[in-house]
Amino acid sequence: MNMDIGKALSDVGGLRDITSRANNSLPPTPDSSPAAPSKKHKLYDFLESRGKIETPRKRIVFEKKPLLHKPVHIQKKPAQLCKELLIRQLGGSRSHPFSTKTSRHVGGRLNLETYYSRPSECLMMLNQLPFCLGFANNESLLAVCTETGALELFDSRFYDRQNEENQPSARRIHGWLAHNNAIFSVNFSKDDSLLATSSGDQTSKVFDLSTQQCITRLGRRGVDGYHSHSVKQVNFCNDSPYNLVSCSRDGSIIFWDMRTHGITIDGEHFQKPVLRIRKAHENSGRDCSITSATWLPQSTSQVISSCSANSALKLWDLRTVHTVRPLPAATTPELTTSKRDFGVTNVCTSPDGERIYAASRDSIIYEYSSRHLNSGFCKTYKDPRLRISSFYVKLACSPDGATLACGGGVQDKTSGVVVFDTTRNCSSSAMLTGGHTKDVTAVDWSSEGQLASISDDGSVRVWNSSLHGSAANLREKNFSEIFYWGFSEK
């Protein structure tokens, strides 16, 4: 059986739908997580109680199969267990244990010119384009989703016994068909036990990573009260595995709580919304697409959102929002740097939540203070090679908050990622070149300081930083010697 599965996965880009309709039903609820007794949808589940955040406890139940080894006595994190379960099922090697140790070289504390990527850290998605990606919060587990609705898991630090250089490489672990339409975002819960996806089928799904089964759906196609267009983004609350927020092309933002009662139709479980904000970014009486809705770190009640019509960012506080006519707690003023409005493609925050970064269609990244949104932006990041030409271009902040990465880099006929140093007063930047041949769209950072990027050429690339001059040595070689390598340059 392991040989058959291994053969199936050896076909590059080949996917197999392992989530049949029968397996997508909601599993029995564990005794430690009973359903809420009240059928009313209340907002206090999102709020902070007495200034102290109480993280709900959740018992992770893993699928038991005869092929699995008996559990070890050392307690491991959910993501590590999930990865090992998947590799054991596929007959993979466990010669190098997965480590959660933080890299010594993280983010912008290194010179921006030290990033590089080897050929073994590039994977190709054949016959389908990667649309989004996301790293797990505690491990080197990378999820990549495509235009066909496929979801694939990669290990960005896989060690091979036969590799004489003993260098980690990127390896495909597992994959399944998550949606029958394009997937626009993917996000891990804080403990990495759950995975949420948003799709063009007007719904989002939440998967149990240990079984790869869909445990609930956020939305119902064609039903009032839910999203009526493509769901552009879905995100878990950092301090609660039950609370999520999603935004859609229809201009609405919906808050979800998986502890509330849902409905089951034909064996499929659908969650009911807790709060829906219609026309969240209404512009001149017309609806506009909500491009991003992100929780502020260390908060269970505040969400920052952006739209496609203008550069305005809005802060929503669930402690003060009203269901009849919701009003934002704060809004950024109109930009005066250009003669016309430019939409925002994506928003991210610094790890401490003090800074907010917005990637604008005018190819400028704006930095705001989360405490003073009404005062406008406090800093801009510019680079002549940065061209944010579509709403698929995303940005991400490193785990230490010192480096900002954004897709859309173009130099001559080469595409790449543009990185900025956020610790300096002046804008210091570099471009990661040589890794992709077509437009680079989404990027994300791992907890260990690795950077992943995807491109319209179908490639998934992992970047590392080094103090040993790896990138500098590559820049000194000719093109034939660095074919399929990527490196950073000023």
Swiss-Prot record:
It comes from the Eukaryota. InterPro entries: G-protein_beta_WD-40_rep, WD-repeat_CDT2_adapter, WD40/YVTN_repeat-like_dom_sf, WD40_repeat_CS, WD40_repeat_dom_sf, WD40_rpt. One of its GO terms (molecular function) is protein-macromolecule adaptor activity. One of its GO terms (biological process) is regulation of double-strand break repair. One of its GO terms (cellular component) is Cul4-RING E3 ubiquitin ligase complex. Residues 18-40 are annotated as: Disordered. It holds the Pfam family WD40. It is found in: Nucleus. Keywords: Cell cycle, Cell division, Meiosis, Mitosis, Nucleus, Repeat, Ubl conjugation pathway, WD repeat. Pathway: Protein modification; protein ubiquitination. SMART domains: WD40 (SM00320). WD repeats lie at residues 178-208, 226-257, 285-317, 339-369, 387-419, 435-464. Substrate-specific adapter of a DCX (DDB1-CUL4-X-box) E3 ubiquitin-protein ligase complex required for DNA replication during mitosis and meiosis. The DCX(DTL) complex, also named CRL4(CDT2) complex, mediates the polyubiquitination and subsequent degradation of cdt1 and spd1. Involved in the regulation of mitotic and pre-meiotic S-phase progression. Component of the DCX(DTL) E3 ubiquitin ligase complex, at least composed of cul4, ddb1, cdt2 and pip1. Belongs to the WD repeat cdt2 family. This is Cell division cycle protein cdt2. It comes from Schizosaccharomyces pombe (strain 972 / ATCC 24843). The lineage of its organism: Eukaryota, Fungi, Dikarya, Ascomycota, Taphrinomycotina.
